[in-house]
């Protein structure tokens, strides 16, 4: 494996992830963990990612635009539900078989298209799926508050309360409860600022069924059907088929 350009290819893939391809975000993060000592199976996995990219080269993030006076500036006209700023936060539980750490994932959409996404392995081992989702929601909240501040500073439009979707009801109840329970006393304080954001009504955690969790493919391998569904609902569409419609890219 010494003559295989593993690191170089990973760098190219991660560049695509950071620009316009959230659909390979989880794969890029997972394969990056083996850069120090990659094996043949890791190189085969990279080639599968490259084959996928070759056959989906027409995928692009698309944003819908509808005429209206509801918003200000360049965002005037976005009135359909997908036009609001919305976020989805998800996590697996102990997906890393080596150290049993979980993977957090989030995606934010505006105008029906993704504007921010991330897949990140958690730094500590979560003792429950609720804890893993709680840590993931805190990570997503940090990004969401930053996006909200940017939009308001640019005077595009105000987001009174940011909607963050989560598919774990126990996590939502935990975030809404200001008391410190035995289940989370060991959780780092940096994650508990999520409670302050909810109490100040800056963020609202909303329950969403797992079937409608569009950040699912950022945390774990999913079926091809779910993968396509996630891509569609974050605006990652075949651009050659939509470029003639009333879309903005």
PLM region descriptions:
Residues 1-60, 64-65, 209, 217-219:
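C-terminal reverse transcriptase regions that engage the nucleic-acid substrate
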Residues 3-23, 92-95, 103, 130-146:
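Conserved pre-motif C helix in the palm subdomain of viral-like polymerases
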Residues 10-12, 19-20, 55-57, 79-83, ...:
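Short, well-ordered loop/turn elements at secondary-structure boundaries
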Residues 13, 84-130:
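RNase H-like nuclease fold core
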Residues 25, 60-62, 109, 163-165, ...:
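Beta-strand cores of modular interaction/reader domains in eukaryotic scaffold and signaling proteins
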Residues 34, 68-84, 102, 120-249:
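RNase H-like nuclease module associated with reverse transcription
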Residues 45-86, 91:
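Conserved cytochrome P450 K-helix E-x-x-R motif and the immediately C-terminal K′/meander segment
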Residues 55-59, 114-116, 146, 150-153:
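Conserved helix-loop functional segments at active or binding sites
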């Amino acid at each position: 494996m010494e003559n295989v350009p593993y690191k170089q290819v990973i760098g190219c893939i991660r560049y695509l992830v950071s620009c316009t391809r959230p659909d390979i975000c989880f794969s890029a993060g997972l394969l990056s963990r083996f850069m120090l000592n990659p094996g043949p199976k890791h190189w085969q996995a990279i080639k599968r990612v490259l084959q996928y990219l070759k056959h989906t080269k027409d995928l692009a993030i698309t944003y819908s635009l509808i005429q209206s006076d509801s918003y200000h500036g360049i965002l005037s006209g976005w009135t359909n539900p997908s036009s609001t700023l919305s976020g989805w936060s998800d996590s697996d539980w102990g997906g890393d078989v080596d150290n049993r750490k979980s993977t957090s994932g989030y995606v934010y959409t505006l105008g029906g298209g993704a504007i921010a996404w991330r897949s990140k392995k958690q730094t500590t081992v979560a003792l429950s799926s609720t804890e893993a989702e709680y840590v993931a929601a805190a990570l997503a909240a940090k990004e969401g508050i930053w996006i909200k501040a940017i939009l308001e500073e640019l005077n595009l439009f105000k987001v009174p309360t940011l909607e963050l979707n989560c598919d774990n009801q126990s996590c939502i109840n935990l975030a809404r409860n200001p008391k410190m329970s035995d289940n989370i006393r060991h959780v780092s304080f940096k994650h508990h600022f999520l409670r302050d954001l909810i109490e100040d009504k800056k963020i609202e955690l909303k329950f969403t069924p797992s079937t409608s969790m569009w950040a699912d493919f950022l945390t774990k391998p999913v079926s091809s059907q779910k993968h396509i569904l996630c891509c569609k609902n974050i605006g990652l569409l075949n651009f050659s088929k939509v470029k003639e419609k009333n879309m903005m890219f």
